[in-house]
C-alpha cells in the first residue's frame, strides 16, 4: 500500500521524466510545462524527487566521457555522477525551496526564486553550470521564443514557470502574470511578422571531419586522419567560399608545429581564409584551447578559450588532491585566455567562442561581432543527449543576439542557425563532409 510520502515521491519522479523528455533528443519541449506543474509543490520530497530525477536522466550522458574516454572505473564514475546530480538538485531545487519557505510558499514567488537560483548556478561555483535552464525550451515555440531576445534565457525561464504554475495562482497573481506575459507576446508577434533575412553576400564552408574521440586521443591514429581532413579543406577551397571553418582542435599537431607539419593548410589559406581550432602550448609549456584565423599563409589572429570546463580542462581546488587516486584528474590544466575578440575579415567580423562557452548568454553577447562561429568537438559525447543539448544552446544564443550562428562540430551535427534560432542547413551526426551556405 502506497503511503502519502510514496505518492509524493512518485509524482516527483514522473515530473522528472517529463522534464528529461523536454531536454532529450526527442525534443518534446512542450512537456516542460506539465513537468513543472506536476513537480512543484510545497512538499520537499516531491520537489527533491523531481529535481534529482530530472537532472540525473538529463545528464546521464556524462558517463560517456568519464567511462569511455576518461578510463574511469564505472564503480567510481557512476557514484561521481550521482554526487554531481545530488549537488545540482540540492543547489537548484533545495536552495529554491529554502528561499520559498521565507515567502511562506507563495506559488507566485517560486518563478522569481527559481530563476534567481538559475542565474546563481550559471556563475557559481567554478564559473557555473548554465545547463538545463528552463528557458531553453522556448526556442522551438514561435512568438514566445522572442522572450529570449527580450531578456535572455533567464527571462525565458521565468516565463516558462509563470505559464506552468498559472493554474495555481490566485486571481491577483494571474492578472499580474498576464501583465508580464502579454507584452512579451506582442513583442514576439512583432518580431515574427517583421523578420527578414539580411543578405550579406557571403559564402561560407563549414567542415565536419568526423574524427571519433578514441582516434583523437591516439596521436598516431589521429595523424593518419590528417590527409582526409586536408582533402576536405581542398574540396571546400575549390568552391571558392569567402571563409572555411573547421572545428575545435581539428588537427593532430600543436599550433607551434603548424609551420613544420601544417604546410598544406597554410598554402590553402593563401587562397581562402581559414578559421580552425588548435591546442597551443606557450613558452611556459602551458596549454591553451585556441582558435586561429589563417590567411595568406600565416596566423593573422588568435583567440584563446576563456570559459574552461571544470574537470575537463582544469581540476579546480581542492579536487587536485584526488589526482593521486583518480588518474583522469592528473592532466595538465589548461590556461585561460584573457579577452574576447572579433576576427576582422573582408569587411565583416566574426567571434569564435569554443565549445562550453556557448552556454553563457552574457559572455557570448560580449563578443559583439556580426556573426558567431562556435567551434566544438562533441565526439566526447557521441550521439547522446549531451550533443543535442549543446547545439540547442547555440540556437538560444542565436535568437538572444539576433545573429547568424555557425555550429562547427567535429562529429556532428554541424549547421547554420538563423537569427531566430532555426537550423536552416545542417550535416547529420556521423557524417564527414562540407556544408556550404551563402547569406
From Swiss-Prot:
Membrane topology: Multi-pass membrane protein
EC number: 2.3.1.269
Any matching Pfam family: LNT_N
Residue spans crossing the bilayer: 13-33, 47-67, 75-95, 97-117, 149-169, 175-195
Xref: SUPFAM superfamilies: Carbon-nitrogen hydrolase
Entry keyword Cell membrane: yes
Any one annotated GO CC term: plasma membrane
Keyword vocabulary terms for this entry: Acyltransferase, Cell inner membrane, Cell membrane, Membrane, Transferase, Transmembrane, Transmembrane helix
Pathway: Protein modification; lipoprotein biosynthesis (N-acyl transfer)
Location of the active site: 248, 305, 355
The keyword Acyltransferase appears for this protein: yes
Any one Gene Ontology molecular-function term assigned to this protein's record: N-acyltransferase activity
Single biological process term from Gene Ontology: lipoprotein biosynthetic process
Gene3D superfamilies with a match to the protein in the record: Carbon-nitrogen hydrolase
Sequence ranges assigned to domain CN hydrolase in this UniProt record: 207-439
InterPro entries listed in its UniProt record: Apolipo_AcylTrfase, C-N_Hydrolase, C-N_Hydrolase_sf, LNT_N
CDD domains given in the database record: ALP_N-acyl_transferase
Subcellular location per the Swiss-Prot or TrEMBL entry: Cell inner membrane
Main location: membrane
Domain of life: Bacteria
Protein role: Catalyzes the phospholipid dependent N-acylation of the N-terminal cysteine of apolipoprotein, the last step in lipoprotein maturation.
Protein family: Belongs to the CN hydrolase family. Apolipoprotein N-acyltransferase subfamily.
Name of this protein: Apolipoprotein N-acyltransferase
Name of the coding gene: lnt
Amino acid at each position: 500500500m502506497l503511503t502519502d510520502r510514496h505518492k509524493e515521491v512518485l509524482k516527483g519522479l514522473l515530473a522528472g521524466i517529463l522534464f528529461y523528455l523536454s531536454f532529450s533528443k526527442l525534443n518534446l519541449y512542450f512537456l516542460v510545462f506539465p513537468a513543472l506543474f506536476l513537480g512543484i509543490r510545497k512538499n520537499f520530497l516531491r520537489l527533491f524527487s523531481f529535481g534529482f530525477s530530472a537532472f540525473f536522466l538529463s545528464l546521464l550522458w556524462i558517463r560517456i566521457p568519464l567511462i569511455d574516454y576518461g578510463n574511469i572505473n564505472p564503480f567510481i564514475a557512476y557514484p561521481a555522477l550521482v554526487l554531481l546530480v545530488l549537488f545540482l538538485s540540492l543547489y537548484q531545487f533545495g536552495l529554491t525551496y529554502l528561499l520559498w519557505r521565507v515567502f511562506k510558499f507563495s506559488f507566485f514567488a517560486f518563478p522569481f526564486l527559481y530563476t534567481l537560483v538559475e542565474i546563481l548556478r550559471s556563475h557559481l561555483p567554478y564559473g557555473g553550470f548554465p545547463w538545463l535552464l528552463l528557458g531553453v525550451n522556448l526556442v522551438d515555440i514561435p512568438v514566445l521564443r522572442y522572450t529570449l531576445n527580450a531578456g535572455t534565457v533567464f527571462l525565458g525561464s521565468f516565463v516558462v514557470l509563470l505559464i506552468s504554475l498559472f493554474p495555481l495562482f490566485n486571481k491577483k497573481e494571474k492578472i499580474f502574470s498576464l501583465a508580464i506575459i502579454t507584452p512579451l507576446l506582442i513583442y514576439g508577434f512583432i518580431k515574427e511578422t517583421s523578420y527578414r533575412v539580411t543578405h550579406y553576400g557571403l559564402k561560407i564552408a563549414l567542415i565536419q571531419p568526423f574524427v571519433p574521440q578514441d582516434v583523437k586521443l591516439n596521436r598516431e591514429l589521429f595523424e593518419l586522419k590528417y590527409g582526409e581532413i586536408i582533402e576536405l579543406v581542398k574540396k571546400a577551397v575549390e568552391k571558392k567560399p569567402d571563409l572555411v571553418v573547421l572545428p575545435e582542435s581539428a588537427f593532430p599537431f600543436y599550433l607551434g608545429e603548424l609551420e613544420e607539419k601544417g604546410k598544406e593548410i597554410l598554402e590553402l589559406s593563401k587562397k581562402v581564409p581559414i578559421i580552425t581550432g588548435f591546442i597551443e602550448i606557450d613558452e611556459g609549456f602551458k596549454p591553451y584551447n585556441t582558435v586561429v584565423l589563417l590567411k595568406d599563409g600565416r596566423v593573422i589572429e588568435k583567440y584563446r578559450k576563456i570559459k574552461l570546463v571544470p574537470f575537463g580542462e582544469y581540476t579546480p581546488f581542492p579536487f587536485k588532491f584526488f589526482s593521486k587516486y583518480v588518474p583522469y584528474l592528473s592532466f595538465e590544466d589548461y590556461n585561460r585566455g584573457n579577452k574576447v575578440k572579433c576576427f576582422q575579415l573582408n569587411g565583416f567580423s566574426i567571434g569564435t567562442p569554443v565549445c562550453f562557452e556557448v552556454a553563457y548568454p552574457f559572455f557570448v553577447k560580449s563578443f559583439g561581432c556580426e556573426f558567431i562561429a562556435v567551434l566544438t568537438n562533441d565526439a566526447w559525447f557521441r550521439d547522446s543527449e549531451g550533443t543535442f543539448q549543446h547545439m540547442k544552446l547555440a540556437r538560444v544564443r542565436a535568437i538572444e543576439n539576433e545573429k547568424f550562428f555557425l555550429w562547427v562540430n567535429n562529429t556532428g551535427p554541424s549547421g547554420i542557425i538563423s537569427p531566430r534560432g532555426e537550423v536552416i542547413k545542417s550535416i547529420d551526426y556521423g557524417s564527414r563532409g562540407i556544408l556550404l551556405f551563402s547569406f
